[in-house]
Curated annotation (Swiss-Prot):
Coiled-coil boundaries: 144-599
Full protein name: Tax1-binding protein 1
Compositionally skewed regions (Polar residues) per UniProt: 481-502
A GO biological-process term: apoptotic process
Modified sites of kind Phosphoserine: S124, S138, S225, S593, S609, S666
Gene: TAX1BP1
Organism the protein comes from: Homo sapiens (Human)
Region (Disordered) residue spans: 481-508, 639-660, 678-712
Length: 789
């Protein structure tokens, strides 16, 4: 019966494609059309094909020829489609007497449809025709060929034969089964007693096996309890490790933030320190340049002084001559009056008039010379103003160049800071990636341990079930042995049929028990193997956990090292702050020390100028009115603030120059003289006044020297000194140095007053506490840089 049921299942796949109008024979060399229908059970594909196979094919490769199945147009899934293929005649087989059939093959190589067999035969003479009545009792005659009729009969007989053969085979199978059952039951009857003995022996063995299984079960329970406890411990360890990793990560993030802040502060402090150093160097250079320019200007002013002194001496000489001539004229007028009173001689009057005319011509010539000299003096002043303006423009250009240089330095610093920031970002990214990797590994280990724990629980349940089943089987086996004895006693009086039925009932429990024992033993073996595998995996996981703990310890050590590095950088930053504070203090002290000599010089200038004017005014008998304002410095103090700085960046404005005080005119010719001099104090610094010059100012000589006598007689309000020279003065010890003294040696002398640390070369001001300085030096030896208590 099974063969009849399997046939439609096997042929069901071949009905997905149905071939229509298949003839029994075709001509060998003629074109052949193949009509087929695609059912909803198949989905067409462009790589599907239809082949001509010999009957008896085994695989899809046994085709004779094939054509690709075209994809139907406007195809809708779940619908039936009719298709046509045309095979060319020269691809078809010859008349060989073999049977062929069409087969539809998918792109996967599956055959989903097959046609009825057919042959390729050449045309033959007209066969004999036969007439036969219709089977439907319709009183109609059907004309067929003899061969067709014979084929129909053969097909019917073949079908009947196949059905009969199938029935015979089924009956033979049934008889064979019945005979086998009879023989088996007879054999079972003969061997039943022997089996009872064997079962009793097996029962004893099973009792021993159950005891051993109980012992093994207890051992497995102990192992399971140990494994569960270890799993709990491992889970707790994993939780603690994860908490520690999270804490370390938070600490690492906070340390990174602190490190970034410290680096940022350090960079800011370094930038400030560099800018202050650059400003200090610029100020030094500016001071050197100003000193050089001052020396040049002093030399130029000295030359101008000499020129002015010569011109003024000539002017005073001419003024004295004019005064003498006026006195002579007055005397002559008096004489003329007296002479006119005494004598009225015309000749004398003509002579006197002619002398008067000559004297007036001389006076006019002297006036013209005075005007010419005044013009020359004004030209010299204009040239000096132009040189000052050129100097101012040069200084402005120099400042522009300095600003450009500062901008370039700032850009370089910014680029360096960006590079450092990129390096720190990459390092932080790598550390974060490593921490994430550690987290993933810990999570995977925790999941693996959970799975192992669940498997252990499952195995424990299976062991409990097996122990319960073994106990139940023992009880059932004892009951069945008693029933077996009763059945054996009753089977003697029964017929063979009933005995056969009882035999069928009795041996089934024993076979089931034996099978169950075998299954239980196999399960126990499998469980032991699984437990061994689990223990191995557990040991491996334990080893992995130890490795992860070691890695965590390594990362903790690295974090500790990072903390130490960060602390060292913080110490360095604090040292930099201290150095910067000390540099600022030193800068302020230098500023004060440089301002104090400037104030002293200004006080000396203010104290000297009134004395000079006083001496000149006392000699003439009248008091001069002087302004109390301080003189405007030509280049200003570079270390002073912008508001209190004298002068505007070295610019020299002629309109702001303090003019000399106006004297009471001694005669009318002085109003026409054009003379402008700056109100700068060209006297020497404190303590450098020449004693001979002061004596000459106090003691007026009695010799009738016309130029000098006229200068001291009228007083111009200037204290010119041709022997003036600039000296260098130490701002700390006030030691004087000649003007041509080397600048580097002068700076070395000034720096020698400072206290220098022999370890770090850090400078301290001269008034710095000696104990604090010694404590700073000792900090380099006890490895505590920040110990300034």
């Amino acid at each position: 019966m099974t063969s009849f049921q399997e046939v439609p299942l096997q042929t069901s796949n071949f009905a997905h494609v149905i071939f229509q109008n298949v003839a029994k024979s075709y001509l060998p060399n003629a074109h052949l059309e193949c009509h087929y229908t695609l059912t909803p059970y198949i989905h067409p594909h462009p790589k599907d094909w239809v082949g001509i196979f010999k009957v008896g094919w085994s695989t899809a490769r046994d085709y004779y020829t094939f054509l690709w199945s075209p994809m139907p147009e406007h195809y809708v899934e779940g619908s039936t489609v009719n298709c046509v293929l045309a095979f060319q005649g020269y691809y078809l087989p010859n008349d060989d007497g073999e049977f062929y059939q069409f087969c539809y093959v998918t792109h996967k190589g599956e055959i989903r449809g097959a046609s009825t067999p057919f042959q390729f035969r050449a045309s033959s003479p007209v066969e004999e025709l036969l007439t036969m009545e219709d089977e439907g009792n319709s009183d109609m005659l059907v004309v067929t060929t003899k061969a067709g009729l014979l084929e129909l009969k053969i097909e019917k007989t073949m079908k009947e034969k196949e059905e009969l053969l199938k029935l015979i085979a089924v009956l033979e199978k049934e008889t064979a089964q019945l005979r086998e059952q009879v023989g088996r039951m007879e054999r079972e009857l003969n061997h039943e007693k022997e089996r009872c003995d064997q079962l009793q022996a097996e029962q004893k063995g099973l009792t021993e096996v159950t005891q051993s299984l109980k012992m093994e079960n207890e051992e497995f329970k102990k192992r399971f309890s140990d494994a569960t406890s270890k799993a709990h411990q491992l889970e707790e360890d994993i939780v603690s490790v994860t908490h520690k990793a999270i804490e370390k990560e938070t600490e690492l993030d906070s340390l990174k933030d602190k490190l970034k802040k410290a680096q940022h502060e350090r960079e800011q402090l370094e930038c400030q320190l560099k800018t202050e150093k650059d400003e200090k160097e610029l100020y030094k250079v500016h001071l050197k340049n100003t000193e050089i320019e001052n020396t040049k200007l002093m030399s130029e002013v000295q030359t101008l002084k000499n020129l002015d002194g010569n011109k003024e001496s000539v002017i005073t000489h001419f003024k004295e001559e004019i005064g003498r001539l006026q006195l002579c004229l007055a005397e002559k007028e008096n004489l003329q009056r007296t002479f006119l009173l005494t004598t009225s001689s015309k000749e004398d009057t003509c002579f006197l008039k002619e002398q008067l005319r000559k004297a007036e011509e001389q006076v006019q010539a002297t006036r013209q010379e005075v005007v010419f000299l005044a013009k020359e003096l004004s030209d010299a002043v204009n040239v000096r103003d132009r040189t000052m303006a050129d100097l101012h423009t040069a200084r402005l250009e120099n400042e522009k160049v300095k600003k450009q240089l500062a901008d370039a330095v700032a850009e370089l610093k910014l680029n360096a800071m960006k590079k450092d920031q990129d390096k720190t970002d990459t390092l932080e990214h790598e550390l974060r990636r490593e921490v994430e990797d550690l987290k993933l590994r810990l999570q995977m280990a925790a999941d693996h341990y959970k799975e192992k724990f669940k498997e252990c629980q499952r195995l424990q349940k299976q062991i409990n079930k097996l122990s319960d089943q073994s106990a139940n089987n023992n009880n059932v086996f004892t009951k069945k042995t008693g029933n077996q004895q009763k059945v054996n006693d009753a089977s003697v009086n029964t017929d063979p049929a009933t005995s056969a039925s009882t035999v069928d009932v009795k041996p089934s429990p024993s076979a089931a028990e034996a099978d169950f024992d075998i299954v239980t033993k196999g399960q126990v073996c499998e469980m032991t193997k699984e437990i061994a595998d689990k223990t191995e995996k557990y040991n491996k996981c334990k080893q992995l956990l130890q490795d992860e703990k070691a890695k965590c310890n390594k990362y903790a050590d690295e974090l500790a090292k990072m903390e130490l590095k960060w602390k060292e950088q913080v110490k360095i930053a604090e040292n930099v702050k201290l150095e910067l504070a000390e540099v600022q203090d030193n800068y302020k002290e230098l500023k004060r020390s440089l301002e104090n000599p400037a104030e002293r010089k200004m006080e000396g200038q203010n104290s000297q100028s009134p004395q000079c004017f006083k001496t000149c005014s006392e000699q003439n008998g009248y008091v001069l009115t002087l302004s109390n304002a301080q003189p405007v410095l030509q280049y200003g103090n570079p270390y002073a603030s912008q508001e209190t700085r004298d002068g505007a960046d070295g610019a020299f404005y002629p309109d702001e120059i303090q003019r000399p005080p106006v004297r009471v005119p001694s005669w009318g010719l002085e109003d026409n003289v054009v003379c402008s001099q700056p109100a700068r104090n060209f006297s020497r610094p404190d303590g450098l006044e020449d004693s001979e010059d002061s004596k000459e100012d106090e003691n007026v000589p009695t010799a009738p020297d016309p130029p000098s006598q006229h200068l001291r007689g009228h007083g111009t309000g200037f204290c010119f000194d041709s022997s003036f020279d600039v000296h260098k003065k130490c701002p700390l010890c006030e030691l004087m140095f000649p003007p041509n003294y080397d600048q580097s040696k002068f700076e070395e002398h000034v720096e020698s007053h400072w206290k220098v640390c022999p370890m770090c070369s850090e400078q301290f001001p001269p008034d710095y506490d000696q104990q604090v300085f010694e404590r700073h030096v000792q900090t380099h030896f006890d490895q505590n840089v920040l110990n300034f208590d």
